[in-house]
Every structure is written in C-alpha cells, then in structure tokens.
C-alpha cells in the first residue's frame, strides 16, 4: 500500500461536502403515554416495553451504518433511554444530553388525554391547535416559533462542531416536525413522525443551510413485522 493510500483522508459523511454534517434525527421509542393518547410534552416518562423493543431495532439498524462521531439527545427519560441504547449499539461513548432537544412545553395540557383536553382546557387546546406560530399555550407552554428557535439553534451548533461527520440526535415528535419545517419551509405537508422513525438532515456548519434528505423512515420496524403503535406520529402526543 502506498504512503498516500495509508494516509488518505476519509470522505466526509455528508454527500454535500466537508462543510456539512450529516445529522440523523430519531424520535424516541413509545411510552405508555403515547399508547394512551396522553399529552406528555415535557413530562419525564420512561419507555414502555414496546418502546424499548423499537429502540433496540433502530439501534441495530444504525449500528450497520457509518459510525457516528457522537450521539445527542433530549434529557427526558424516553429520549435519553433511546439514545443510550443507540450509543451502545454503535459503540459511541460521546453521548450528550441537552434540554434544548426536549419536546414542546405544553403548558396546561400536560398529562391530559387529547379527548379530555378539548373539553377541560378549551383555551389551551385552541392555542395548541392554532396555526399562529407566535401563539403560546396557557400555563407556560411554548409557541411553535419558540420551539423551532430552541431546536434549530442547537442543531446548528451541533453541525458547527461536526463538519464532515455523521451524528445521531434523539428528540421528540413536535420538535422533529419543526426541524423538518425549517429544512423545507415551503411544504404544506404535515409529516408523520412515528416512534423511532429516522429523519436525515445535511446541515452546513458554516452557512446554516439545511437539506432534508429523508423523514419518517421506519424500515427497521417493518423488517421485523413490529406493530407501529406509534401514536403521536403527527407530533401531537410528543
């Protein structure tokens, strides 16, 4: 082998060049709250058994792909546990938990079933359902603009640290929807984000340009004929 070959620089993880980070975003596995149609928001709920199985399946899939430089995650238990399973499978020791990746704060809607929220907290539910992006949810809840700013800003920071590298990020349904909207703002399609689904972004660490390559990919669940009982695929259950 020539000296040049021995010291060859590996190609960047992103097909768009060394300025871009390939950011693989995974929604956490299922929780009992998802299964029961409970609005979780920033409630700290663990995975249920189905969610743990989903996390193992997505981890198994990601372990067969290019090794990530790091795994980042929301610090909420359902995301952190999913991230830990992925990091272990991918043999990655660099696991970073950060509240910037948390789900949308749902204010007065926290802990309510969707059907009950419409009746018991009509003002909060109306605010949640509003298409006005600056509309905050009563009880300290975030607006969509606030959610987007928090999540997008942190992914830009991650991309700046990992130019030319691949990283995995574990987050939540509504947060991931906002990331997709930021990358593709002209689309009117509401994207379905099932539990442990994969979205792939290429993000320039210099210019902040985003490219959405893939969203809502659950091929790892289909291969094992695993039931996709993933309420909140629209981001609603968080």
Segments from the language model and where they lie:
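Phosphate-handling substructures
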Residues: 88-152, 211-217, 223-238
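Loop-to-helix element that buttresses phosphate recognition and phosphoryl-transfer chemistry
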Residues: 25-81, 86, 137-152
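Domain-level recognition of soluble alpha/beta enzyme cores
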Residues: 186-211
């Amino acid at each position: 082998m020539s000296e040049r070959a021995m010291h060859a620089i590996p190609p960047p993880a992103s097909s768009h060049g060394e300025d871009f980070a390939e950011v693989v975003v995974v929604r956490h596995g299922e929780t009992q709250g998802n299964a029961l149609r409970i609005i979780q928001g920033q409630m700290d709920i663990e995975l249920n058994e189905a969610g743990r199985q989903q996390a193992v399946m997505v981890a198994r899939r990601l372990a067969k792909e290019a090794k990530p430089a790091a795994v980042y995650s929301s610090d909420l238990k359902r995301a952190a546990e999913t991230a830990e399973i992925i990091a272990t499978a991918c043999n990655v020791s660099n696991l970073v938990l950060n509240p910037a990746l948390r789900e949308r704060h749902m204010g007065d809607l926290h802990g309510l079933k969707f059907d009950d929220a419409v009746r018991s907290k009509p003002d909060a539910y109306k605010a949640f359902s509003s298409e006005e992006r600056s509309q905050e949810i009563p009880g300290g809840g975030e607006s969509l603009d606030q959610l987007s700013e928090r999540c997008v800003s942190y992914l830009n920071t991650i991309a700046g640290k990992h130019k030319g590298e691949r990283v995995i990020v574990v987050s939540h349904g509504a947060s991931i929807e906002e990331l997709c909207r930021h990358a593709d703002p002209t689309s009117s399609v509401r994207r379905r984000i099932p539990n442990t689904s994969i979205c792939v972004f290429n993000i320039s660490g210099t210019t902040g340009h985003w490219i959405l390559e893939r969203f809502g990919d659950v091929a790892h669940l289909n291969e094992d004929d695993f039931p996709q009982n993933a309420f909140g695929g629209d981001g609603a259950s968080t």
